[in-house]
Every structure is written in structure tokens, then in C-alpha cells.
């Protein structure tokens, strides 16, 4: 949990309030905002969804540049997953060029102060070593404490995993994609992964293939299948 409580939050003093990279998990809103005066200093904030006048709680310190450069055009730079009664906050940091995460628990409503809605269960951890490439933020966490994601290294996309119990680890490359990939997702039990693949000159919203794969007990993927429907895939 950050102790930089005195840092100015620009969003709170702006006449026109806006949220950047908005996420809603349960009754908590998460977003990104600048801190300090530098354009490369930002943090993740949170507040209750139904309390518009609640003062934002800053969840990450100013030492991160939370940004997504995946495939050159980026996207959302963090993800929050509610798992095992906790909030798993995962973000991409451009200073270390690595994946970080922190675990929070929700403060009971009758104990919430004006500025505190989530308590840190675990201090921030740098999950991955720095990579010469970019991460996507469509992360998935399994019940076995593995994080799955997609990254690009040397202009090739990979499905990878990280052990949530370890720090500063090499990414474990599970699959090398033939073309571009993104939008990683899973079913509730995280026994099935899905993602989309596409090839140039198309963008993913123009033409793509939806793929599925099962995850075995060791975290490896098996039985990769491409979704096929003559009507949907028709040119």
C-alpha cells in the first residue's frame, strides 16, 4: 500500500471528472490517473461505485509508469481479478518493463474511512523479469496460482505463464503464435482458455479466429481448437 497520500490527484480537482481505463469489480471502481507533475508518473485508484463523493484511494505508488504498448497501439494497462475473496491487481510497468501484482481485500462497509476501501494483503511484487517486448493486459489467474498472459517479443506473440508465488522470474512460454494474438480469457474454473488470432493486413476487429485450449493440472495447454461456424467465418 502506498504512503504517498499527499500527492495531488488531478482528476479530483478537475471541473470535468473523467475516468481513464475504467474497470468495475464488485462495487469498486478502478482507474488510472496522473500523479505529481510528470506525464510518466501515474497510479491506479479506487473508490466505491455508489459513492460519487468518496475520495479516491491510491493503490499504487508513484514509482510506476503504468502503460500498455502491446502491438504498438496498446490498450488497458492493468487488470483486476476477484479471486478467493480478494482483489488481484495486475499491471504493466514501463520502467521495469515487467508485470507486477498486488493483492487487496475489501474493507467492511461499516469500517470504511473516507479514503480507505481496500486493505493490502500482500505488498507489490514484480512477477516477471524485464522483457525486450510488450505485454498485453488480458491476464488470467488459475486456482493453482498461475497467471496466464500474452506478450510480444521480437515481433512474435506468445502465450506465457508466471507463478504467483515467485518474483522476477523468466516468463514460461507455452505457445508461439503463427500470427498476432490477443484477448485472452477463460471459463470460471480456468480449465479452458480462449483467445483471438489474426494476420496482417487485417485488424482484429476486421477478421479473426477464435481459439480454445484446455489447461491440464501442470498448467500446460492441450487440445487447441479453432472455433468454426460457416456463417460467422464467411468472407
Q: What would you call each of these model-derived segments?
A:
Residues 1-5, 158:
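Blade/loop signatures of beta-propeller domains
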Residues 4-46, 76-77:
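Beta-strand-rich domains and repeat architectures in extracellular enzymes and scaffolds
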Residues 21, 77, 137-139, 183:
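Conserved beta-strand position repeated once per blade in WD40 beta-propeller domains
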Residues 24-26, 81-85, 142-144, 188-189:
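Residue-level detector of Asp-centered blade-edge/turn motifs that repeat once per structural unit
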Residues 33-45, 63-75, 84, 90-100, ...:
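A flexible loop/linker signature enriched in serine peptidases of the S9 family
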Residues 48-52, 104-107, 163-167, 215-219:
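Short loop/turn segments that connect beta-strands within beta-propeller blades
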Residues 168-175, 220-230:
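Blade-edge beta-strand/turn elements of extracellular beta-propeller
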